[in-house]
């Protein structure tokens, strides 16, 4: 069972800033993908090992998971992977995007916390403020991938992104997945669980315009 963490808590005002990319990646000029809500990071560990022509940053609000991921990094040869702890809004707001401005090629939100109660919808990760912050670090044509098994959350994410003038929904056939951050179509642990239990997956792709 996934443990929910309130992203609006004062505990997350202090964040782990993303340092200059030349300090964390062997080749900082590679295309950059962000996975927001990366959990334990296993998805990114596999991605980064199989796709050496991309750099990956995982952002996770649960500090223990980031600490464990960084411990694993010490025993693995992932020269194109970095983990950052904190609320994504605060990470991008406080760093002013200096380290990654106009460098993000794509972003994924995979099965984020649904926060079912209406009074908690403001805790859902995709909010107008975050989209504005992210757009400042995304190149024109950069992509946002959203995926969930919760229809209400999917509708919320779609509505929030569609209301932004900075993003446009595009059909799947317009995306060359062979050139994407995940050409092997690697699945997260949650996605494997959903498929195994024959549950429906809702997903969309948006382009920065």
Curated annotation (Swiss-Prot):
Its EC number is 2.1.1.33. One of its GO terms (cellular component) is tRNA methyltransferase complex. S-adenosyl-L-methionine binds at residues 35, 60, 87, 113. Pathway: tRNA modification; N(7)-methylguanine-tRNA biosynthesis. It holds the Pfam family Methyltransf_4. It catalyses: guanosine(46) in tRNA + S-adenosyl-L-methionine = N(7)-methylguanosine(46) in tRNA + S-adenosyl-L-homocysteine. It is an enzyme of class 2 (transferase). Substrate binds at residues 117, 149. One of its GO terms (molecular function) is tRNA (guanine(46)-N7)-methyltransferase activity. Keywords: Methyltransferase, S-adenosyl-L-methionine, Transferase, tRNA processing. The active site is at 113. It comes from the Bacteria. Gene3D superfamilies: Vaccinia Virus protein VP39. Belongs to the class I-like SAM-binding methyltransferase superfamily. TrmB family. NCBIfam families: tRNA (guanosine(46)-N7)-methyltransferase TrmB. Catalyzes the formation of N(7)-methylguanine at position 46 (m7G46) in tRNA. This is tRNA (guanine-N(7)-)-methyltransferase. It comes from Prochlorococcus marinus subsp. pastoris (strain CCMP1986 / NIES-2087 / MED4). The lineage of its organism: Bacteria, Bacillati, Cyanobacteriota, Cyanophyceae, Synechococcales.
